[in-house]
């Protein structure tokens, strides 16, 4: 049994940790991310605040169930013109998002939180400016 838990069902995040020789197990937090995002946005939260809060909520929820373990929570959001672009629910939504972002700057905001005994012990948030340019959305249809 590992001493580290990734509070996520993301296979990519788990793979990144394992490739970097961080032995861990995965336990999804199953928080309602969409509801939390919408509630925070209604209250005027920035995309950075949303990313930070989701990472912390995920880590703390799993940490409360596993107090002796170190728990990593992470979240990423796309900020386009101060609006969060959510994960597409289907192929058409994905193509619409690609068209919307094509040729325009947007930001990837990623947050990581580490919790133990149900409380945050470390956190980090970073923001990268991205420019997506492609005709792929037209080619895929």
Q: Where do the model's predicted regions map?
A:
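Residue-level signal for inorganic ion chemistry
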Residues: 17, 55, 75, 94, ...
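Anionic-ligand binding region
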Residues: 111, 120
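Catalytic beta-strand/loop signature of glycosyltransferases that borders the donor
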Residues: 29-30, 122-124
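A secondary-structure boundary/capping signal
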Residues: 73-74, 110, 126
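Short beta-strand and adjoining strand-loop segment in the mid-core
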Residues: 82-89, 113, 125-131
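Active-site-adjacent loop/tail segments of enzyme domains
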Residues: 70, 76-106
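N-terminal polybasic phosphate/anion-binding patch
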Residues: 1-70, 83-84
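Single conserved hydrophobic/aromatic residue that forms the stacking wall/gate
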Residues: 132-141
């Amino acid at each position: 049994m590992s001493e580290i838990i990734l509070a996520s069902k993301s296979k990519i995040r788990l793979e990144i940790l394992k490739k970097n020789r961080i032995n861990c197990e995965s336990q999804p937090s199953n928080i309602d991310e969409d509801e939390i995002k919408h509630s925070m946005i209604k209250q005027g939260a920035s995309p950075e605040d949303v990313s930070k809060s989701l990472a912390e909520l995920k880590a703390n929820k799993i940490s409360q169930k596993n107090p002796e373990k170190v728990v990593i929570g992470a979240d990423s959001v796309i900020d386009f013109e101060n609006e969060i672009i959510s994960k597409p629910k289907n192929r058409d939504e994905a193509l619409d998002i690609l068209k919307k972002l094509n040729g325009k700057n947007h930001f990837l905001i990623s947050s990581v939180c580490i919790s133990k005994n149900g409380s945050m012990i470390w956190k980090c948030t970073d923001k990268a400016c991205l420019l997506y340019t492609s005709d792929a959305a037209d080619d895929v249809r």
